[in-house]
Amino acid sequence: MRDPLPEYPWDAMEPYAALAAQHPEGALNLSVGSPVDPTPAAVREALAHATEAHGYPATAGTVPLREAIAEWFERRRGVTVEPGAVLPTIGSKELVALLPFLLGIGAGEAVVFPRIAYPSYAMGAALVGADAVAADDPAEWPEHTKLVWINSPSNPDGRVFDVAALRTAVERARELGAVIVGDECYAEFGWDAPWDSERIPSILDPRVVGDDHRGVLSAYSLSKQSNLAGYRAAFVAGDADLIAQLLTVRKHAGLMQPAPVQAAMVAALRDEQHVAEQRERYRVRRETLRSALEYAGFRVEGSSAGLYLWVTRGVDAWEAVEELARLGIVVGPGHFYGDHSPNHVRLALTAADAHIAAAAERIRAAATLAA
């Protein structure tokens, strides 16, 4: 039998959530990156119109969906992929956790992911008995590596890989004979120069791989850009042979995205206005929260893109979590993201405008009182 899995990290937040709930003005939860803004009307309408879905959905995705994904890659990422080289997934977390299994990776092989990373990468390795290796430097990737995850923009620290860094990573993965995957679900949210005006590069960018997608995949989710976390709407694209392999296993496993969700995705992918509006919401929230945190002595590190502020004041993360919980603010400790960020906390921008404003006010007021 497999070794017991670790406890779900966020379960450890219960006492701090309880402490925050005691605040006289209520708790403000900034610990989870779950969207709170409305799902675009056109997307909801597309879903509603597709509810006559009595048959099993297409595991490969409908033709309109595959075409919409390919068009989106060309338009938004500057990447050319064929409709036959894309595959819808039931959210992106499912893919992250299951990809080692889907690729047939097992004991004696390694899955590599960032040193500071969302825990699902390591969990995917654990589920198949593979070695989980947290390493950013491609030179440190072991010879038995079979899968490499690149997260750009990254969660939690908002790091962005430029073209040169992506090219180096791809070249090293190919030397090792490993599949390399870019987890790119925050690509629409670049904040600091140059990403406030330049397109964040995909791992499939022709400047990275030319026209050769061999061994390379890009994963993307509509949860954040389109407020579709409840729909479980995501996809993966790239190496056509790998996509075919994943499709075969997913057919056997019954991993099918519901037909109404596929219809909703087509609408979301073809409408850019709602994405621009959502980006502006997050920009304002980010500025509001960042200003207050810096006023209170927190240092924002990284956070050049994505939906989080990654901050530190030099104390243990749990101490900072408790301090903010006493203000009624729930945040995530750096310990959740590996062993290399014990003094950081993550604050999500996925809270209502009023909640972000209230959190900023509480942080400022407490800092002023302590001065």
Residue ranges and their predicted role:
Residues 28-36, 48-67:
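A glycine-/small-polar-enriched, mobile loop at the entrance of the PLP active site in fold-type I
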Residues 70:
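The alpha-helix within a helix-turn-helix
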